[in-house]
Amino acid sequence: PVWKNIFNVCAVKEFSSCADDYPMSVHVLDVGKADCIFITCEGKNILIDAGETSIYKFVNEYLRKMNIKAIDQLILTHQHSDHVGAMSYIVDEFNIKSFMMPQLKDDMIPTFRSYERLLISLDNKGMKAERPEPGKSYDIGPMKIDIFAPLSQYDDMNNNSIVMKVTYKNKSFLFTGDAGKESERDIISAG
């Protein structure tokens, strides 16, 4: 789509022109119709989603080329395969300091293989998923993550997406996962 090309051109120009003198960088990885966003700032790293399973090698190589060994905050915005796919490999290959994903109703818990592998990988490392709390903030080095959603456990998986703002100094980025209209209305109503 045209908007994607415009965003890609603007993002490349903006981030490449300030990368040398601005310590925060946001990398929106091209993983097709999936999501994978890497944020780094002053030695602290955040990875939001991990695309489909098939792109694991690409994500792994990308992070290795940047000399990344640890991820301070790994975030699964919601439990659809185009967000969780390669995440178990990330957990296995990197030092993950904290992991966050939304709580789901029992009848919505996925049974697809990549999600089950993620749970096994977390268990093998003795990690538990932290549940996002709207209104709560997390400090990741000089960056701050403010959680806006999910405000409820919804019947639509996309509406269970973690919606967050990542801020460094006077710059902030809003990440919405695949939150839909119901979640958006609730965020606006909550103020």
Model-derived regions: residue spans:
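Non-globular, low-confidence helical/coil segments that flank catalytic cores
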Residues: 1-191
